[in-house]
Amino acid sequence: MQDFSEPGSGKADGEGSAVPSPAVVAQQAVQELVLPQPVIRMNPDEKHAQLVRVPTWMWLDRGMWQPVSRTVSVPGVSVTATAIPRAAAWAMGDGKTVVCAGPGTPYAVKYAADSASPDCGHTYLRSSARQSGEAYTVLVSVTWDVEWHGGGQQGAVPGLVTRAQVPLRVAEAQALVVS
């Protein structure tokens, strides 16, 4: 149990019951936030081999790219913490990192097969054949900004992070020109 008898804890001198400060209640609200895990989507699909020098599209399910809030109320104080996804950093497994400001654009057949994603993509220059399992490990880290307000106060909590990863095989294909 939290000891609110410390200075600045929200307990007034001589009071018989502790009233936590809004910042303390905010910590609890942040701890109780349930952030969705990223669901990685790619084109070509991560179940199939990607080709060297062909653009890879990456995106996250749009349903997870939404604000998440949690309100915690204790006698005398109610605080709401809201987490908003800010960026997705994709470690592509080949030493490159791609930072996307949003969830990315889902690939659709209306796009040319060799077109690059308008906002979240990567082009591999080497095969993954020499990697463990002959695949790169693609790791996405979504950073969430958290703001809270309540009890006449407000504040921010530095980025929370959720992560997901998938293996991605990248193959080389060679064309044979026959005349």
Model-derived segments and their meaning:
Residues M1-S179:
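Extracellular/lumenal mature domains of secreted and surface-exposed proteins
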